[in-house]
Amino acid sequence: MSMLFKCPPGAYLGGIVPTTCPIKWDQTQKLVFGRKFADRFANAGAFISQMAWYSLLNITVNDSRLVITPYVSGLTIPATTVLTKGGNDNTTIDGVPEINGIGFATVKFQIKNISAETADELRLLGTESMIQPGVSNIVAYFLQTSDAVVWNKTSTGDKYDGFEIFNLVVTDIGNEGLNTNTMYDVQFDMKGGWSQYWGYQVLPFNPRDMSNPAS
């Protein structure tokens, strides 16, 4: 189902599920990347299992493998924008704007004081995110404060996948001299509707303590 339109409409108006407690993502401090593989976590028990996460970080021979970034700084996810045509003119009926879709969101952040080798391995992930124009084979999980992970439940509501990302780019290093950090700017894109089925789960361990095996 599109986030914009459900066709045909229901026989009557549906309800709006109440949110009993506010859900704040707070700060994203690390990211976990993997190839598209919706069934890497078999169920809710596996998803909150420290052993399951560590096993996926240490797998080297299949597409269920995960990799975790160093700490990231300043990560922001802008709200997507509505794409419209016309409005208040003769190009549309009664001058009503036509809604054509939802635009992409460009996620930006920085990684401080990493080696050239680490930056290059992140760039290899970028290759997975732009196999050809408009095609990606990589997803991302967001690791938040309070030991939480944000993931994609998908339309079925029972998956534990990451969010599809496109065009992951790591720039050249930036340095402003004495008593400053060396910085890499990083960004990727997510298509309109990316967050329709997001889930938020506090894990019984600190996922930001996880690390990749030695290369």
What are these regions (language model features)?
Residues 1-3, 51, 130, 183, ...:
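Detector for methionine-enriched segments
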Residues 2-110, 163-180:
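Solvent-exposed edge beta-strands and adjacent loop segments
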Residues 29-32, 70-72, 121-130, 168, ...:
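Generic hydrophobic, helix-prone segments enriched in Leu/Val/Ile
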Residues 83-158:
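Structured, beta-strand-rich domain cores
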Residues 158-215:
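Mixed-charge, glycine-accented linear interaction segment located at domain edges/termini
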